[in-house]
Amino acid sequence: MGLAAPKNKRKLGNDPNNTRWSRNTENFGHRMLRSQGWEPGQYLGPQDASHAVYHTAASASHIKVALKEDNLGLGAKMNRGDECTGLNAFKEMLARLNGKSEAAIEKDKKAREAHAMNVYVERKFGTMRFVSGGFLVGDVIQEKKEDAEAESTDGTPEPAEATVKKEKKRKAGRDDDDEAQSKEERRRAKKQKKSMKETGSGGDDVTSEEDSAKSKSKKSHKSKKEKKRRKEEPASDEQESEDEESREKRRKKEKKERKERRREKREKKLKKKQQREEDSSSSEANSDDETTGVDTGASTPVASGTSTPVSQVSVRHLARRRFIAQKRMAMKDQQALNQIFMIKSS
């Protein structure tokens, strides 16, 4: 309705801190949480959880959200530009002039680099604090019972020493048994090898004949394979040479076709340019004739009995053509260009 609408005056002083929304208990979120059994002032989640010990007053307060307008990491801050480049190198040079040793200068340089790295990490990722695993799992921390351990250690040490000696004796006995078993196994293996050699002397002739027959069959098989390979190799070489020749011919044909296409495109472009230049030159000549005709007619009117034909071109187009013609004449004239660009001719 504009100015005729009813005017509603609002007082901004009723809620200057903008806390009315936090005290409002009739919104959708409060109603939904109440339906699930939650009440104002309570924590979210089960009350008897293992991590409920670590809840504080901040767990029941409102969540604060900050708008992130940059692409930096969480907690990172923009470079404020208060760092002077080259200042550290200048300080090192002054220290050398004052007679400071190279080892001390290198130590200071490493300390500065470590400090800069820590500052960068804190800006990029925030301060990192390592917590024990119990906090992550949610266990309750319990102090160790030192008294019970002290009582157990204060007992009689003599029986413990006796048990240790017994265990050592048992281990020594086991080691002796293992060595005896290994020696017996070696002896048995040697005896078996000797018996195998004695029994296998009679059958050497038969095995030698079988081995010779097998070697002959293998040699014949290898010779046949070599002959086949020799026959197949020239045929494969001829096929490869033919394939290469055909590929080269195709490549040459494709190159020729591409060159012809490029020539045709160039010729078409040249023809189009020539036509445009001819059209533009003819239109300029016509426009010059028309402008001269209009000027002469306006300056010296001639009375005649017959009606003269009126040009159908608008006055705006005629003025624009005249302006373009004048501009071209000025661009061709060197003296006019010097006047435009404020160049003094010597």
Curated annotation (Swiss-Prot):
PROSITE patterns: G_PATCH. Residues 1-27, 146-315 are annotated as: Disordered. Its main location: nucleus. Keywords: Nucleus, Ribosome biogenesis, rRNA processing. Residues 25-79 form the G-patch domain. The keyword rRNA processing applies. One of its GO terms (molecular function) is nucleic acid binding. GO terms for cellular component: nucleolus. Residues 15-27, 293-314 have a biased composition (Polar residues). GO terms for biological process: rRNA processing. Belongs to the PINX1 family. This is Protein PXR1. It comes from Pyricularia oryzae (strain 70-15 / ATCC MYA-4617 / FGSC 8958) (Rice blast fungus).
